[in-house]
Regions:
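Residue-level signal for inorganic ion chemistry
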Residues: 35, 56, 71, 93, ...
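Conserved C-terminal structural/oligomerization subdomain of aldehyde/semialdehyde dehydrogenase
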Residues: 34-40, 226, 263, 317, ...
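Short, well-ordered beta-strand elements within core beta-sheets of diverse protein domains
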Residues: 37-44, 59-65, 151, 262-265, ...
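A short hydrophobic/small-residue beta-strand
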Residues: 175-177, 354, 435
């Protein structure tokens, strides 16, 4: 069979029609909650990938020549189809990735919002008229698509990380080739199928899945027809891709690792801070690049915050994301679970204490845990945890806090809670991060620029800046006037 029995529950079977029956022609996809084999996703050979890039190059010329309004119309139809298939797409994502169904359906809506946004931005790629330095010249700029763009996307947000890149690329007039994670390819093929149903040509948007991620990355970074690479993943891999892309000066966008501080000042609304901490930390079982990774709480409110935070954490239900009432699904793999557990064990050995009793769970499930008496020098504070663990550190002054919060190579997201307007501005400007949530634990939206500083990456996704990542600015100088 090309699909496991569970996959028969997807009502719109066109979303999984790409799956192959022969294991020799595909990559096995399993449910991390149950270990069940879901089926096989089609794998691309090296020649397949090279052919995809060639076809994308040819198709891009025709796609860019279409009126922006025409491209926008297809993107809007894609957006509508994503909404209409929210139930099936959410279920498919939960099956292959593990997150609770409500979160998965929420990701479908979030991912779709980028398609809607960039459908409108497609019609607003304005140039400029520049006042000339002399009377006989006229100066203008125009924006043009850069050509073939490619992307490598992660498993933790298997739909949104594709639409956040494909939306602006297609809106700009680029063609787009994406390699999703081998752990979660089904969602990628499904959203591409809906794009085709919306009228987007199959050569303009392509999904390729290689057995060897490094090989695909090497093809993307070395192929002369690819002019842009967008990557979401670890800083370590991003660094390699940037080095490889430098050979022919490809443009790159990198959304890399994070180590987000979540800060609670002594003048904070503690209940609001706890609610924000829950939203920021435990979404997708803590497997997000922008989730709170380390908590800094002022000594005056440390005990109060710890007590309320842990009480809320103990109410979380761990289990299969398809089951009613589940808040926390499995982590993605056994190696991920072992790495998270090693950080917990190391912190406890160094003096940290779990606020509530630790529970070891079977399979890929992990009980959420709050650790108190954590110190800034512990490994769990400097590493990106990527799991349902919240280490909480004390601080006594704003200056001490800023020094600790900025003591990292990363600079993606940060969060803090305070009701003092003077402190709010001071801290917001002092934090060395691309994004700052102020009295808010959920900050990502299609209308605002998403991205980091330092070794958390370069470039921005979403907002009006997102489409510029896929366009060249050309300056035209008219003489003889």
């Amino acid at each position: 069979m090309s699909k496991g029995m569970t996959m028969q529950q997807i009502q719109n079977q066109s979303l999984v029609s790409f799956m192959v029956a022969n294991p020799q022609q595909g990559i096995a996809v399993t449910n991390p909650a149950t270990g069940e084999l879901l089926g096989y996703a089609p794998v691309s050979t090296e020649n397949d990938i090279l052919n995809s890039i060639e076809r994308a190059h040819v198709a891009q010329k025709e796609w860019a020549a279409l009126p922006a309004k025409t491209r926008a119309g297809m993107l809007n139809r894609w957006f509508q189809l994503l909404l209409e298939n929210k139930g099936d797409l959410g279920r498919l994502m939960t099956l292959e990735q593990g997150k609770p169904l409500a979160e998965a359906q929420g990701e479908v809506l979030y991912g779709a919002s980028f398609i809607e946004w960039f459908a409108e931005e497609a019609k607003r790629t304005y140039g400029e008229t520049i006042p000339a330095p002399s009377a006989d010249k006229r100066l203008v700029t125009i924006k043009q698509p850069i050509g073939v763009a490619c992307a490598i996307t992660p498993w933790n947000f298997p739909i949104a990380m594709i639409t956040r890149k494909a939306g602006p690329a297609l809106a700009a007039g680029c063609s787009f080739v994406v390699k999703p994670s081998e752990s979660t390819p089904l969602s990628a093929f499904a959203v591409a199928e809906l794009a085709y149903q919306a009228g987007i040509p199959c050569d303009v948007l392509q999904v390729v899945l290689g057995e060897n991620s490094r090989q695909v990355g090497a093809i993307f970074t070395s192929h002369p027809l690819i002019r842009k690479l967008s990557f979401t993943g670890s800083t370590q891999v991003g660094r390699v891709l940037m080095q490889q892309s430098a050979a022919d000066i490809k443009r790159t966008s990198m959304e890399l690792g994070g180590n987000a501080p979540f800060i609670v000042f002594d003048d904070a609304d503690i209940d609001a801070a706890v609610a924000g901490a829950m939203a920021s930390k435990f979404r997708n079982a803590g497997q997000t690049c922008v989730c709170a990774n380390r908590f800094y709480v002022h000594s005056k409110v440390y005990d109060e915050f710890i007590a309320k935070f842990d009480a809320a954490v103990q109410q979380l239900n761990v289990g299969n994301g398809l089951e009613e009432g589940v808040n926390i699904g499995p982590v993605i793999s056994e190696s991920a679970k072992q790495g998270i557990q090693a950080l917990i064990d190391g912190a406890i050995e160094q003096g940290a204490k779990p606020v509530s009793a630790l529970k070891k769970l079977d399979g890929l499930f992990m009980q959420p845990v709050v650790l108190k008496d954590v110190t800034h020098d512990m490994k769990i504070v400097s590493e990106e945890i990527f799991g349902p663990v919240a280490p909480v550190i004390r601080f006594d002054s704003d200056a001490q806090l800023i020094e600790m919060a900025n003591d990292t190579i990363y600079g993606l997201a940060s969060y803090f809670y305070s009701q003092n307007i003077h402190r709010v501005w001071k801290i917001a400007e002092a934090l060395e991060y691309g994004m700052v949530g102020i009295n808010e634990g959920m900050i990502s939206t299609e209308v605002a620029p998403f991205g980091g500083v330092k070794q958390s990456g370069i470039g921005r996704e979403g907002a009006k800046q997102g489409i510029d990542e896929y366009m060249d600015v050309k300056y035209l100088c008219f003489g003889g006037n």
